[in-house]
Amino acid sequence: MKKMFLFAACLAVLACSCSEKEEGTVKDVRASLKINANIGAPAVSRAEKTAWEAGDKLGLYVCNGTLGTPYNQNAVYTNTPFTYSAAGWTSEEILLDENEATVFAYYPYDATLTTPSALPVDITTQTDHLYGQGDTKASILNRNVNITMKHALSQVVFRMKKTEGYRQEGVLTGITLKNVGSATPLYTRATMDISTGSLTKTTAGNVEFSAGATLTDKAVSFSSIVVPVDATAGKDMQAVFTIDGKQLQFTFPAGTKWERSYRNIYDIVLGNNGLVIGGADGSGVTIEPWTDDVKGEIQLVPVI
């Protein structure tokens, strides 16, 4: 990579005017790209990315307009890592000339990525995949680019507590989202186009939450990042909760959808008659941009 930059620098030297040579000064007619990346739609959860930490890495593709055309037709501008520190974002120099470049970014950086239109996504790792594009074209005249990173996935959150009169311990040992019947709205693997955040679903499967706690009268949250779900045609998904050795389930209604960049929050109260999601006033099921929305009351029933 350094040899390629050196070769390019030599070409720039040859392009300088004779007057510059006579003065003993040679100017490089290019500048190095600088970025400022921020995360859009902040939220709070263990799985989602809300702020940068030292050592975080973005992958950048500097292109001639579209993702498949590297800047100046040079592969050196593909999948360049930018690393975050207290000083901001740094990388090896990405030199720009007068030609305008479109900058695409993704998180987290994958050194093995060769097809940026098909970045592998695996829900079992609970990685919050982000994508973004520079707000302006980059060139020697504009080398500072701002990038707002967006969430490509969705999130499901269950906020759970028990009533004071609940007669058992309230030991939660598992939460599973399941496909029902032949329909497969739930997927565990997909690929992402880093320029648009669009996902191609590849492997259907159930989603297991990391859940283990003894419920009290104070709500505690359990969350999972999920591949977005299009509006279901029927009752194609269930949530199964294992509490005090028993299974309680909820079948999501037709039309349920979980959109990318949103988190879907379900408030659950455990009582002697089972679990209740939501309330009689229509509260308790909230959708937030990770734009609040509220749905009606939902009941969970024991698995027979």
Model-derived features with residue positions:
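Sec-type signal peptide cleavage vicinity
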Residues: 2-11, 15-304
